Amino acid sequence: MPKVLHRRKRASATDLYRTCKVSGTCPSDVIPKVEGNTLADKILKWASLGVFFGGLGIGTASGTGGRTGYIPIGGRPPSVVDIGPVSRPPVVIEPVGATDPSIVTLVEDSSIIEAGAVHPNFTGSSGFEVTTSSTATPAVLDISPTGTTVQVSSTNFLNPAYTEPSIIDPPQTGELSGHVLTSTPTAGSHSYEEIPMVTFASNAGTGSEPISSTPLPGVRRVAGPRLGLYTKATQQVPVADPAFVSRPASFATFDNPIYDPEETIIFEHPSIYTPPDPDFLDIVTLHRPALTSRQGTVRLSRVGQRASLRTRSGKRIGARVHFYHDISPIPSTTTGDIELQPLLPSGSSSADTLYDVYADDQHLDAVLQSVPSMSSRPLVPSNATISATSVASSHTNVTVPLSTGLSVPASTGPDVELPQFSVPVSVLTPSFPATTPYSIYIVGSDYYLFPSYIFFPKKHKRLHYFFTDGYVAAW
């Protein structure tokens, strides 16, 4: 198949003329075309010698239409009238005839001209009449100021924008004593506002509720599955050292006390370095901690980012690592029961029930003897009263059975069995008939209110079945 040749387009004549005029290598048709010396241009020049076209502008020049320009279709251009200076009218010169005198009178008769003020003519013989006064009192002018009255007026305008509103202070709830609470109704139309309380942590919760009303954002309670800690792209590295919980940065670099362990930690390593723990090699970032639950254990997790490779552009590439430390590795049992140690040894007396589990016996005896009220009376009274108060010492926390001001007899509950005591029954008869009902006060430090509520099914709203250290008034 023959090869098809394509002719390349030459540059324009103007571009060629700019480059080849100086060197003299222009083609034969470039210079006449640019300089206007073609055959057509020569014919127009020769024809213009014998034919006059006027100011029509016919030729090889720019098409401007001559001096008058092109006339638009549909009419002639509007004419412009030049307004020149206004000429003055000529002054008519009167010719002088032969009969006119050549002397012109310049001064007219002065008697005809009246100018200036008229002078009066005095014709009388008597002179002016002068009037005089015979009073010899000198003229005294009274220049004392007259009394002036000053009037000051004031006007009060009521502006609602600056009126202070009326403030009604309702009586607040006051505590009369340590056990009795009283409240009074509010004044006016104002009333107290009841705010529903929210239970943040309960036994029936799922574990995802916040443990306080304003939880700290540092450590999550239980991390959700959205973290992606156990994916195929994440390397799993267990950390057995418990220092990972409090000092995670000490595994990747040397100790630096100026950092917050609850936030993301960023490391700036030199080109060649050796970390304290080889598992933390090339770690540049340790993210915030998260508490997770895995197979019945509590686990502290931190996600780290390695920077093993570095490109020419400065980007660092590395794997994603999941560092975790098991805080409570409790093995699961088949029955799920955990054996508990008895709090009191066998053969303990009733006086041992008043002491703390972790109290030191030798130190407790020294504390009891230092209290004068306890050295002279037994620990347990004869009427089986229970009262306890905590006492803190420099060695340990000890619970010592001191008096709280009220000795309340212990009452039986649904799961408390006490020995029966023979208490004599005494009937009190009032000396006068009671016509007005009085309040009956039940004194108790710990008792159950409506024990039948215990066997009711649990609801979302928790019911308080008992009160402590209070009085109940019943009609």
UniProtKB/Swiss-Prot annotation:
Per the record, the GO terms for biological process are: microtubule-dependent intracellular transport of viral material towards nucleus; symbiont entry into host cell; viral penetration into host nucleus
What does its PTM field state? Highly phosphorylated.
Chain's gene name: L2
Keywords on record: Capsid protein, Cytoplasmic inwards viral transport, Disulfide bond, DNA-binding, Host endosome, Host Golgi apparatus, Host nucleus, Host-virus interaction, Late protein, Microtubular inwards viral transport, Phosphoprotein, Viral penetration into host nucleus, Virion, Virus entry into host cell
Briefly, what is this protein's role? Minor protein of the capsid that localizes along the inner surface of the virion, within the central cavities beneath the L1 pentamers. Plays a role in capsid stabilization through interaction with the major capsid protein L1. Once the virion enters the host cell, L2 escorts the genomic DNA into the nucleus by promoting escape from the endosomal compartments and traffic through the host Golgi network.
Subcellular location as annotated: Virion; Host nucleus; Host early endosome; Host Golgi apparatus
Q: Identify the species of origin.
A: Human papillomavirus 62
Q: Which GO terms describe its cellular component?
A: host cell; host cell endosome; host cell Golgi apparatus; host cell nucleus; viral capsid
As for family, the record states: Belongs to the papillomaviridae L2 protein family.
Query: Which proteins does it associate with, and in what oligomeric form?
Result: Interacts with major capsid protein L1. Interacts with E2; this interaction inhibits E2 transcriptional activity but not the DNA replication function E2. Interacts with host GADD45GIP1. Interacts with host HSPA8; this interaction is required for L2 nuclear translocation. Interacts with host importins KPNB2 and KPNB3. Forms a complex with importin alpha2-beta1 heterodimers via interaction with the importin alpha2 adapter. Interacts with host DYNLT1; this interaction is essential for virus intracellular transport during entry.
- The name of this protein is Minor capsid protein L2
The disulfide bonds in this chain are: 20-26
The membrane spanning regions, by residue number, are none
A Pfam family found in this protein is: Late_protein_L2
Q: Which domain of life is it from?
A: Viruses
Q: Does the keyword tRNA processing apply?
A: no
> Which terms in the Gene Ontology molecular function aspect does this entry carry?
DNA binding; structural molecule activity
Q: Where is this motif: Nuclear localization signal?
A: 1-11, 455-463
